[in-house]
Amino acid sequence: MLEILLLRLSRSIGGAALLALAPAVAAAGVAYFDVARGSHPHDVAAAPAPGGPIYYTAQSSGKLGILDPKTGRYEEVALGSGSAPHGVVVGPDGAPWITDGGQNAIVRVDPATRAVRVFALPADSGYTNLNTPTFDRKGRVWFTGQSGYYGRLDPASGDIKVWKAPRGRGPYGMTTTPSGEVYYASLAGSHVARIDIETGAATVIEPPTKDQGARRVWSDSRGRIWVSYWNTGQVGMYDPAAKSWREWNLPGVQPHAYAVWVDDRDHVWLTDWSANALVKFDPVTEKFESFPSNRSGADVRELQGRAGEAWGAESGNDRLVMVPAR
C-alpha cells in the first residue's frame, strides 16, 4: 500500500481554519483524507461537479468542513454557539444545508462567502434531535428528528413546519426520488414512511423483516427505495410502483448496515460496521463487493457521492474516504 502524506500546514482566513493535506492513496484507487483531530465527521455530501468540494459535518466541534479533494486542503466553518451538526446535503442552489441538532435548526453555508444562516425551528417543536435533510422537487428542505419528528423548511419564505412522526421516535435517514417524492426511515420504529409533500402526512410502509432497524434510505434512478437494516445486517428494496419488497443479507459474520447510497449506475453502496468496510451491491447480479478500511474502527455513518465517486466519513478515524464508483 502506498501512502503519501504532506506536512500539515495551517492558517486562519476570515475565521475559518484552513489546513493542507495530501490524500493517503490505497489499493484499487481508494483515497483517504485526514481532517481535524477530534472532529468526528458524521455525514458527508459531494458537490456534483467533478473535482468539486466535499462537505462534512464536524459534529464534535460544531463546524462544517469543506474539503478540496484535488489538493487535500480542508476548511472549517463554525456554525454557531452550541452547534452539533449531523446531516448535510447540497441543495439546488449549490449550497450545503445542514441539520444541526445542537442549535435545533437548519443551517445554510454560502459556498462562496462562507456566510452562515440559521433557520431555528419553532420554539414549540421542542428538541427534535435533528438528523437528515433532503430537498423536494419544489426546492424545500425536509428533515428528520430522531425524537419523533419530521419537518419542512421553505428557504424562500423561511417558513418551517414540524410534524410528529406517526409512530413516535426514530426518524433517521431521508431521501427524495427522481420524481420528487420524500421518504424517511425510522431506526427505532423499524419502518419506512412516505411523506405527502403538500399535506405533510406520513404513510408507514412495513418491511418484511420485523425489528430490522431501518436506518438510512436512498432512491435509485427508478424511484425504488433502498434501505439499510442496522439490526439485521440486510439491505432492503421497496418498489413503490409494485408495492413490493426484496431483501438481501450482507456477507460476513453478524453484519450491521449503517449507511446506504445509490450511485449513477444504480449500484447500491452500504457501510458495514462489523466488517469495517464499504460494501457495493449490484442489483442485477446480486453480488456484493467489499472495500475494508485500512484502519480499524472507521465507523462510517454516511455515504454520498457523485459520478464515479463514493464518499464516506470515517467518524472513528477523523478522515474521509473515497472509493471509485465504477
Label the predicted regions.
Residues 297-326:
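Blade-level signature of beta-propeller repeat domains, shared across WD40, Kelch, NHL, RCC1
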Residues 68-72, 110-114, 154-158, 196-200, ...:
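Short loop/turn segments that connect beta-strands within beta-propeller blades
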Residues 30-35, 73-78, 115-122, 159-164, ...:
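A short beta-strand motif characteristic of beta-propeller blades
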Residues 2-17:
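Bacterial N-terminal signal peptides that target proteins for export
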Residues 37-51, 81-93, 124-138, 144, ...:
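Beta-rich, blade/repeat-based domains predominating
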Residues 27-56, 67, 323:
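An edge-strand/N-cap motif at the start of beta-rich repeat modules
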Residues 63-65, 104-108, 148-152, 191-194, ...:
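A short loop-to-beta-strand structural motif that recurs across blades of beta-propeller domains
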